Amino acid sequence: MAKVLVVYHSGTGNTKAMAQAVAEGVKEVPGVEVVLKEADQVSVSDLVNADAVAFGSPTYFSYMAGVIKAIFDKAYLSRSQLKGKPFGAFASGGGGEVKSVQSIENIAASCGLYKVCEGVAVGGMPTESDSQDCRKLGTTLAKASKK
């Protein structure tokens, strides 16, 4: 069974709500398991063992949270094992969340991961429309994980 790892950090609960919506989207695809983990609980082996990964972060100074960046720092030496693995990104914030998504996408690509969908950037608490975008991200990743 294919596995999608949803990694997130959330300070206020907004990014957690987005992560849960991404996980719901993954569950819509038969034959795919979803693993939802807070960033400080994620190891490099979690990334290597997943068939696809979603990264979610709050926005700090138009950038991803340090705990998300730390995952990439640890994973960089294992990038050969991550090469071509599908990923997607999502972020929440009170400004700069598009840049936060872009920062995740850029560093994930440098670790060899392959972007399969547009990131989701949300200002504040996700609306139903935002949650739908997150579910779509999850569904897209789930389908990509089976290839």
Predicted regions and their residues:
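FMN-binding flavodoxin-like domain, especially the glycine-rich phosphate-binding loop
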Residues: 2-4, 14-17, 21-31, 35-45, ...
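Short polar catalytic/cofactor-binding loops
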Residues: 9-13
